[in-house]
Amino acid sequence: LMAYLLGGGAEYFRDSMEQLRENYPAPAFYGAMNFLSTHDTPRLLTILGLTSPAPQTRDERAVYRLTDKELARGKTLLKLASLILYTFPGTPMLYYGDEAGMQGFEDPFNRGTYPWGHEDPELLAWFRTLGALRREHDALQCGAITYHAAQGRALAFSRRTNGDHCITAVNAGSEPVTLTLPWDAPLALDVLSQQEFFCGDGLLRLTLEPYGTMLLTEVE
């Protein structure tokens, strides 16, 4: 996933995940503990935001903070990463502070104290939304996965149970992407923006803006 977000093709992410799905029992794949950063890795925001070579010395890494431009990039990609994490098969695991905007390179710079009262409100709200949506939709908890787009910077997959259906769509590139997705219902709702889309022929046509995301559900 990190390779995809940092410039790799979505097809390589799909192929890697499908190889895991095909080689593991379903309970293992759908019950996996999925994480993007831990106490043994640099902070997710730092890795995704960094645009210049990482500082080489320990002293430099200890005090390095992303520039405003890097921070904006990091937050944008962190939202994409977390949307995929929270809607993918398995259980999303969140390293404390990633939801608050903590930065840092390798241990011990990734193990700072939680920034009580100084959290990033935008990221906090985003993660709360993702958690609420995952609790609300059975499909995101236990639904089977099907890929509908995985080429270049565009990725789209669905999760489905007998009574619930969601599609995650992500554009990790700097240009708009147009997708055509299968959709049975006459309407689809992007629960992230509350925008509705009409579908009359079993196909849903939509455009994802640069670094755009959608989480589509059926309209009740």
What are these regions (language model features)?
Residues L1-D107, R159-R160, T168, A172-T178:
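Conserved alpha/beta catalytic core and glycan-binding cleft of carbohydrate-active enzymes
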Residues G74-K75, T87-L94, D98-E220:
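Carbohydrate-interacting/catalytic domains
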